[in-house]
Amino acid sequence: MATQADLMELDMAMEPDRKAAVSHWQQQSYLDSGIHSGATTTAPSLSGKGNPEEEDVDTTQVLYEWEQGFSQSFTQEQVADIDGQYAMTRAQRVRAAMFPETLDEGMQIPSTQFDAAHPTNVQRLAEPSQMLKHAVVNLINYQDDAELATRAIPELTKLLNDEDQVVVNKAAVMVHQLSKKEASRHAIMRSPQMVSAIVRTMQNTNDVETARCTAGTLHNLSHHREGLLAIFKSGGIPALVKMLGSPVDSVLFYAITTLHNLLLHQEGAKMAVRLAGGLQKMVALLNKTNVKFLAITTDCLQILAYGNQESKLIILASGGPQALVNIMRTYTYEKLLWTTSRVLKVLSVCSSNKPAIVEAGGMQALGLHLTDPSQRLVQNCLWTLRNLSDAATKQEGMEGLLGTLVQLLGSDDINVVTCAAGILSNLTCNNYKNKMMVCQVGGIEALVRTVLRAGDREDITEPAICALRHLTSRHQEAEMAQNAVRLHYGLPVVVKLLHPPSHWPLIKATVGLIRNLALCPANHAPLREQGAIPRLVQLLVRAHQDTQRRTSMGGTQQQFVEGVRMEEIVEGCTGALHILARDVHNRIVIRGLNTIPLFVQLLYSPIENIQRVAAGVLCELAQDKEAAEAIEAEGATAPLTELLHSRNEGVATYAAAVLFRMSEDKPQDYKKRLSVELTSSLFRTEPMAWNETADLGLDIGAQGEPLGYRQDDPSYRSFHSGGYGQDALGMDPMMEHEMGGHHPGADYPVDGLPDLGHAQDLMDGLPPGDSNQLAWFDTDL
């Protein structure tokens, strides 16, 4: 190791060389600066003399770090030589940085840049000058292009109109080249004569190259609003539509992209394309296989069809639904699938296109993409499926779609859950296979969980409750479904939905579900314990009062509140109480609410379904002696006897059963006369002994068929964009048909309700009569 004395001796020996190096740097320049004025700055130097603050710098450390940065060492002579080279080439380095084009070709200039990631000061200072130089050059070129085009346009316009097709072709090529540069492109679009000549040439030529160049020129012009207007004013749209029939792919591409730009940004373009027959041409192009071309074409169709019924019908007549469904079934390119799903969404609100899409397999094709990573594609498919689903209740092969929809109920996206619930509601209506499939894949549990999570979001709870209502009746798994709602803790939340803030559409659906749940004896006690019976009576009283009030005012039309007829609520609540009354404890609660006078009054209703459910609940209540006596005391014998002659077998049978039970304590003679009357009324076509009927009417509907929801026209609200108020079968059956034969409608009492004891208290918390209807309206959005 060197001693202190050795180091001092070495330092003294190097002192003259160090001073000489510093003097040279001050006279010339530091090897890494390239700037003469560097000597007058206070930038630190290797000697440390240039900055008084660094007099105490450890030079050994500096030398150590310097050595670490290089793989070889330099002698003082070599350093001096390199320093001299840098000083001699300083001007060349500055010129190379700022004006590289002025250097002689092949000239080598030593660089002062040690690290490629860190530019030198000269290089950094040169950047603005380079940018300025390029800007000036571009400006000169732009001006040259503009001047050249301005001078050439009149002559090129004449050449495009020449009779010699060779001349026309050459002119078209030149115009196409000019349109690629911005300055000349602006000059072209500012010449109406030139644009008209381009359009005319494109439309009339038989030469492929000429067509390609002219179409390409219009495509270039269409990237500017001024160009779009020029094309539009020159009659370019009919010509471009004609080009959609070209056998040349490049011409097709130019034509469709130019039309797409026009449709997006040029006012009046949509009508012009429709009038030129563009829709038919575009639908015919859907059999192409270029996915990017198809994406632009389908987007054009969406723009044209949106909000225009005539366009939707033209697409239908041209075979559009089948072609669009084929695309959804065939391709995987996300943008194409998205644009195609947008067209289908627009068409799915058209009553004519809807069945065509369904018949083409649209439900299954759209269902293929519900698990796609693209959320915009999934959402469009769901919206379209929701719109189509009310027309797809008879479709086969829906197993995969149903399973996916049940899974989507667990999504955190509210829009996804809303659509999935609405689709399931429609697809489970009147389709026992779909009902069984949904039950088998855990649909009951998923729907109950959805209702629990939704809270008071009725756009989710209403379709979910309707789906549960469908799943709990009229199929082999119905009893399992009725039990499953209870086992998955659904009864409390279902009963809760009968209360505020629920609106009438949701209340109607919930009443129907409770009626179905009551078909399962195991649900009788839990429903009673949750307070379902008093709330049903409360709703019944309110709805009946509304119908009475309207009748007393001379109204003949059925009253709608939030899209629901109050007669539907009367029928639904009475029907639910009818099934609940099969349980002896429930009968006691129902009778204790002083409902018998109201049920007797309902026997006078002009609506057959209300007559039937009223007679049905009285039939159940009449099993108890006290109730039978109360029914008779309310004067039920007269209306029941009248109803024996009803042409509705359900009404007549229930009426007979009530009369029969009311006669159990009567003298034998009365029983005999009644038996004759019942036999003659009930068995007019097939006379038989009364005692052969056993328990007539005691279990009508026991197979799980809600008496108010017939197989051919269930109480069903379609969840598609047409709104809650539209039914899949075109009618709402709960109160649709009046009794065909004689009925006591003229004597229907309109005086006040019998005293229910707690009627006023029951009125609190009912939905308002004038709330806005909750519905999805028919829209392309």
From Swiss-Prot:
Assembly with partners or alone: Two separate complex-associated pools are found in the cytoplasm. The majority is present as part of an E-cadherin/ catenin adhesion complex composed of at least E-cadherin/CDH1 and beta-catenin/CTNNB1, and possibly alpha-catenin/CTNNA1; the complex is located to adherens junctions. The stable association of CTNNA1 is controversial as CTNNA1 was shown not to bind to F-actin when assembled in the complex. Alternatively, the CTNNA1-containing complex may be linked to F-actin by other proteins such as LIMA1. Binds NHERF1.
Native source organism of the sequence: Canis lupus familiaris
Residues found modified as Phosphothreonine: T41, T556
Region annotation Interaction with VCL: where it falls in the sequence: 2-23
Family: Belongs to the beta-catenin family.
Chain spans, region Disordered: 34-56, 705-781
Phosphotyrosine: residues carrying this PTM: Y64, Y142, Y331, Y333
Residue stretches of biased makeup (Basic and acidic residues): 734-745
Record PTM S-nitrosocysteine, positions in chain: C619
One Pfam family here: Arm
Single GO MF annotation: transcription coactivator activity
Processing after translation: Phosphorylation by GSK3B requires prior phosphorylation of Ser-45 by another kinase. Phosphorylation proceeds then from Thr-41 to Ser-33. Phosphorylated by NEK2. EGF stimulates tyrosine phosphorylation. Phosphorylated on Ser-33 and Ser-37 by HIPK2. This phosphorylation triggers proteasomal degradation. Phosphorylation at Ser-552 by AMPK promotes stabilization of the protein, enhancing TCF/LEF-mediated transcription. Phosphorylation on Ser-191 and Ser-246 by CDK5. Phosphorylation by CDK2 regulates insulin internalization. Ubiquitinated by the SCF(BTRC) E3 ligase complex when phosphorylated by GSK3B, leading to its degradation. Ubiquitinated by a E3 ubiquitin ligase complex containing UBE2D1, SIAH1, CACYBP/SIP, SKP1, APC and TBL1X, leading to its subsequent proteasomal degradation. Ubiquitinated and degraded following interaction with SOX9. Ubiquitinated via 'Lys-11'- and 'Lys-29'-linked ubiquitin chains by UBR5, leading to its stabilization.
SUPFAM superfamilies linked to this entry: ARM repeat
Lineage: Eukaryota, Metazoa, Chordata, Craniata, Vertebrata
Gene3D superfamilies: Leucine-rich Repeat Variant
Chief place of localization: cytoplasm
The protein, known as: Catenin beta-1
Modification N-acetylalanine, positions: A2
Keywords: Acetylation, Activator, Cell adhesion, Cell junction, Cell membrane, Cell projection, Cytoplasm, Cytoskeleton, Glycoprotein, Membrane, Neurogenesis, Nucleus, Phosphoprotein, Repeat, S-nitrosylation, Synapse, Transcription, Transcription regulation, Ubl conjugation, Wnt signaling pathway
